[in-house]
């Protein structure tokens, strides 16, 4: 709101125009001299420059350089009708109606260069839109560069068919209605000097509501309302040494983190299990759950680049951090629950937990670029990422059933778990590329990448091998590429990766895969350009217990037509065809093996034609829109036609209006459809 008020005071500045033409005209007698024939001999400079004794000296001509330039777009969004599922609309679009500051962009310059030489300000989406930003950059040559960046995202996700066994009734058990805010500030001192200190601060926070599931003893899931709060602050500072042959950066930073979430429920709530267990139905009547996390970390970073010879560049980077966290958890619940391992029903439970963890984390990278010949480049890069977790959790659980007077009868003895475990993850990568310019038009690239690592992490709850699980990673990747410029108008780029893996971490990891990409661009003339793109991925894991297969393709064609520099008409269009097909084995509820399949065949198209109105070339109309349609496991259709109109009212003022129609539908989940018209109309002030 403060920003909007400040903008209102700035609007009058757009109305100020450059000095009137009458003030810039010369005096009548000066006009006559200026309009004299070119062949008339000019008077000597010393004579023409001397003013007459009886005439005062003329005032210097006013400067036409403006200290302020920019534009502001504001208007009102109107949604006259809406039909369909409001939660799906908010999960995909989430546009509201009312006054909006759609865009702000201006520049301030100080001719006297006092506090700053130049200041740039930009803002977008203010007034209630789900994504709004503000950005400021100020600089004074040789003294400082300051950048401030603010972003706010309203994230809503409550698709009824997701994580909801009762769909279309009930609600998404993984729902979110939160705001995420991010602020970044960077200050660089003495920019352009050999030694440049800098300071930076980052703040990221989230707050809002949601729905999550509470799971007692893996027997049932209960969807409960949740309050979400978290924030992270990062402080860093350092110095850069910049010389002709080498650059060095030394940085020290720290991070603080906190997360405070809580869930509560009162009243009878049934879980996802609809069938009875031993003749009884499980339910939840009350719940109070809280957990808090606090974390800190200090890190050190050093990086350097050097050019010892004209044919050799070297670089390296090292980062060490040691984050530490503490956790506190508690819950107390009443209802009808069961311990399947002892076939015992109980009416209440209480859990208390605390823990601490420490994670030394080391990351390093190094590499070089060597140019033994003008047409040949050799690039080598190596990186390693290693961290070790040391954790010590302490958890107590107690169960009760019924009451005897004021005495709660224990249903089962309290359990206490005190664990000490560690996790270790090591990741390494080495890559070599050779790039050869075979001719002035043809460049070839070949390379090899080797990825290896090992990990020992906390196992899942159904693990039969103990609390920890170990794995290894070995992957060999071949690389190839081609860049061919047949003429100034035609260029082609090809890239390929082929891999064979001995060990992987996850069932769906890249294993034996091939990935390719092709791009082509042809410019028929100065007005017409066509671009094409093709990508493909084929990943296979033939392990008899996995049998994972993933095939994905994407083909796109785009056209840009701008005759006569788009003064009267321009056209942009793009069509995209994509397919995804995957299969993998899994174990069902009774350990019966089955196959999970997913398929999606999609078509996406976008087009926009801009036309200058007859007799009013400054007025523009845009006709176009986009659509998405897919067939397969989740068939869906999404249409967005649009019309835009921009009409100049006077030199610095434009009237802009836009209409869009949003239509979304699914064949299998028809209750998730919505349709709406959205209008926005407003003005643009320009100076």
Report the location of each language-model feature.
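Gram-negative and organellar
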Residues: 50-70, 77-687
């Amino acid at each position: 709101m403060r920003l909007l008020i400040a903008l209102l005071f700035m609007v009058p500045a757009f109305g100020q125009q450059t000095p009137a033409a009458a003030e810039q005209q010369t005096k009548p007698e000066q006009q006559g001299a200026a309009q004299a024939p070119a062949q008339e001999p000019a008077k000597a400079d010393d004579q023409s420059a001397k003013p007459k004794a009886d005439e005062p000296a003329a005032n210097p001509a006013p400067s036409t350089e403006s200290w302020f330039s920019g534009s502001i777009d504001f208007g009102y969004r109107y949604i006259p009708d809406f039909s369909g599922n409001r939660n799906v609309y908010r999960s995909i679009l989430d546009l509201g109606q009312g006054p909006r500051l759609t865009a702000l962009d201006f520049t301030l310059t100080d001719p006297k260069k006092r506090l700053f030489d130049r200041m740039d300000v930009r803002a977008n989406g203010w007034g209630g839109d789900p994504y709004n930003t503000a950005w400021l950059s100020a600089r004074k040559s040789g003294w400082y560069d300051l950048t401030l960046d603010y972003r706010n995202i309203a994230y809503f996700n409550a698709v009824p068919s997701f994580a909801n066994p009762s769909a279309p009734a009930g609600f998404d058990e993984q729902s979110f209605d939160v705001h995420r805010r991010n602020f970044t500030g960077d200050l660089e001192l003495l920019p352009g000097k050999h030694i440049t200190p800098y300071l930076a601060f980052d703040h990221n926070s989230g707050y809002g509501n949601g729905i999550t599931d509470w799971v007692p003893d893996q027997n049932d899931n209960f969807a409960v309302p949740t309050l979400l709060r978290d924030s992270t602050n990062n402080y860093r500072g350092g110095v850069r040494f910049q010389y002709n042959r080498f650059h060095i950066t030394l940085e020290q930073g720290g991070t603080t983190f906190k997360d405070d979430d809580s869930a509560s429920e009162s009243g009878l709530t049934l879980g996802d299990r609809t069938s009875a267990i031993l003749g009884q139905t499980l339910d939840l009547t009350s719940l109070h759950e809280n957990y808090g996390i606090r974390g800190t970390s200090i890190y050190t970073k050093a990086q350097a680049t050097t050019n010892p010879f004209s044919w050799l560049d070297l670089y390296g980077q090292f980062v060490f951090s040691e984050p530490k966290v503490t956790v506190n958890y508690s819950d107390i619940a009443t209802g009808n629950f069961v311990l399947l391992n002892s076939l015992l029903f109980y009416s209440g439970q209480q859990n208390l937990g605390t823990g601490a963890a420490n994670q030394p984390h080391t990351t390093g990278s190094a590499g070089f670029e060597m140019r033994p010949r003008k047409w040949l480049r050799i690039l080598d890069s190596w990186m390693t990422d290693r961290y070790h977790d040391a954790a010590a959790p302490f958890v107590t659980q107690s169960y009760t059933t019924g009451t005897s007077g004021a005495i709660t009868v224990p249903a089962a003895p309290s359990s206490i778990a005190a664990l000490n475990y560690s996790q270790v993850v090591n990741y390494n990568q080495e890559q070599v590329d050779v790039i050869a310019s075979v001719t002035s038009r043809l460049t070839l690239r070949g390379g090899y990448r080797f990825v290896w690592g090992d990990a020992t992490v906390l196992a899942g709850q159904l693990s039969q091998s103990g609390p920890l699980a170990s794995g290894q990673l070995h992957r060999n990747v071949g690389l190839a590429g081609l860049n061919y410029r047949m003429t100034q108008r035609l260029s082609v780029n090809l890239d390929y990766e082929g891999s064979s893996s001995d060990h992987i971490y996850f069932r769906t990891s890249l294993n034996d895969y091939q990935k390719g990409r092709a791009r082509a661009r042809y410019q028929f003339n100065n007005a017409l350009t066509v671009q094409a793109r093709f990508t493909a991925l084929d990943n296979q894991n033939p392990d008899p217990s996995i049998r994972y297969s993933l095939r994905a393709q994407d083909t796109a064609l785009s056209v840009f037509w701008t005759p006569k520099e788009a003064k009267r008409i321009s056209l942009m269009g793009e069509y995209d065809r994509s397919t995804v097909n995957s299969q993998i084995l899994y174990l069902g509820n009774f350990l019966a093996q089955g196959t999970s399949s997913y398929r999606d065949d999609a078509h996406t198209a976008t087009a926009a034609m801009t036309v200058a109105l007859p007799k009013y070339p400054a007025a523009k109309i845009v006709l176009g829109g986009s659509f998405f349609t897919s067939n397969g496991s989740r068939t869906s259709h999404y249409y967005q036609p649009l019309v835009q109109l921009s009409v100049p009212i006077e030199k610095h003022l434009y009237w802009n209006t836009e209409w869009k129609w949003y239509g979304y539908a699914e064949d299998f989940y028809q209750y998730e459809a919505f349709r709406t018209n959205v209008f926005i109309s407003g003005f643009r002030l320009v100076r």
